Amino acid sequence: MAQPTHSEIQAVDPVLTNMLVGYMQADDRFIASRLFPAVPISTQSATYYAFTKKYWFLDSLQKRAPGTGFARSGYGVETATTSAALWGLEHPIADETRNNNQMPMDLERAGLQWLAQQSLIRKERAFASDFFANGVWGTTDNNSATDWDDFTNGDPINDVLTARRVISNNTGQDGNTLAVGYIVHQAIVNHPDLVDRVKYVQLATMANVEGAIAAAFGVSNYLVGKASYNSANEGQTFSASAIIDDDALVCYVAPQPGIMS
């Protein structure tokens, strides 16, 4: 046999330079920033004003007798405070590690993408904890007997229309947004009531189907939260968990948050 052998002169297999397996989630799987657009502030804490709602729904005009003055009325103003907590994370790269890197991707770029993913996960989890929760909103339905994956008793269209009507009556704005977890989206697309309404979509692309679902619910925005995270501790076996699970939120979202919106 000819010597030296292949295994003797090649201590390790060559590194592929055109392939690198990754598990980074696409940005559009996260919906927090799309559901509630950020309002930038110049200080960590701030005070903001709000008109007192009840005055804007009063029927205050009164008849005026000839030669008399008009009845007078007005509106109230309230203040509230907000505080922006500072979150951060470092990903140090030692010079020795950088110099010995054999991956077909520089470590700074990989680290930047990893940090961006960490930021998205933290924001999405905080968002889900704060807003997909009982007691946060004026109306909550936690009746498992009418879940939307129950194709006999579940009635997603009526539930959403009812929620939109409640929002309209209490705010003067029509609920224009429905946000759901991925498991809820799967129940919706398979529900007979929705299937019957979207079956004539010209081309059953994901965008067309989701647009037809939004139209069936009467909302402008239909958002599906698909992001997941590792719920195990760092040293434990990976455990995938949906950030937004079997939840749905109907709300009004100002297209461009600002003064009087």
Which residue stretches match the model-derived regions?
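N-terminal alpha-helical "arm" segments
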Residues: 1-37
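N-terminal leader/assembly segments
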Residues: 10-12, 47-73, 89, 98, ...
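Assembly/oligomerization interface modules of large self-assembling protein complexes
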Residues: 22-91
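Intrinsically disordered, low-complexity boundary segments flanking structured domains
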Residues: 32-38, 73-80, 162-167, 206-213, ...
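Residues in well-ordered beta-strands of folded domains
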Residues: 49, 83-85, 90-92, 179, ...
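Alpha-helical scaffold segments that mediate packing/assembly in large oligomeric complexes
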Residues: 95-177, 182-199
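Extended oligomerization regions of viral-like shell subunits
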Residues: 173-261
